[in-house]
């Protein structure tokens, strides 16, 4: 089992201390929020991202296992206007390009405040939206890991693990997989048996609820 920790768990000034602690404990991965590394326009800093990845690997022995908080600071909604959706598509493709420079194989899609649904037709819109992103992710050697967010996150879209599995199977592309959040399963009182026969859909496992 490979272990990683998210860098939103501590402040930036403690990075070096925590990295060393992780190495001592045998951790091999670091999950990052891009704006924790580059505060402004992180996805425009591809060269810097590549350098960060190299330094982290060569000096600490850590790889970037995952990215979270992909849409931090964005106000657009998937199921808002067409222009909002297009803006989010392009922004997410930039995030995927950024992930490629980091050799990161999982982009956590949570973004609860940007994904509230308003009608039954939104499910089909979601299939098209995430299908396009899944295709782009595969072309860049990475994966969108869709995370169920319970209602306490303030969203009404994909609140439980089974709903996300249904979406992934509907999209049916290798670039969209399940980011399994154990905190969500515990909150929803989901039985682990729902994952029987679905292991091939899981790309990443979380033991904490993201905020």
Locations of regions flagged by a protein language model:
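Active-site groove signature of glycoside hydrolases
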Residues: 102-118, 145-150
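N-terminal pre-domain/capping segments
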Residues: 1-104, 131, 138, 169, ...
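Glycine-rich tight-turn/loop motif centered on a GG-T
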Residues: 79-85, 116-123
């Amino acid at each position: 089992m490979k272990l990683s920790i998210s860098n939103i768990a501590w402040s930036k000034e403690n990075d070096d201390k925590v990295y060393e602690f992780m190495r001592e404990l045998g951790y091999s991965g670091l999950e990052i929020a891009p704006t924790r590394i580059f505060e402004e326009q992180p996805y425009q800093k591809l060269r810097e991202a590549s350098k960060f990845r190299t330094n982290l690997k060569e000096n600490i022995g850590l790889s970037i296992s995952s990215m979270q908080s992909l849409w931090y600071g964005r106000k657009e909604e998937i199921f808002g206007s067409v222009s909002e959706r297009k803006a989010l598509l392009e922004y997410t493709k930039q995030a995927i390009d950024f992930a490629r420079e980091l050799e990161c194989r999982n982009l956590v899609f949570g973004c609860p405040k940007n994904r509230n649904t308003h009608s039954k037709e939104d499910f089909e819109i979601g299939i098209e939206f995430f299908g396009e992103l899944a295709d782009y992710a595969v072309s860049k050697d990475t994966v969108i890991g869709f995370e169920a967010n319970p209602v306490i996150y303030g969203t009404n879209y994909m609140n439980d693990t089974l709903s996300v599995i249904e979406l992934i199977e509907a999209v049916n592309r290798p670039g969209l997989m399940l980011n399994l959040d154990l905190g969500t399963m515990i909150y929803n009182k989901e039985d682990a048996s729902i994952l029987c026969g679905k292991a091939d859909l899981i790309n990443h496992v979380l033991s904490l609820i993201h905020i």
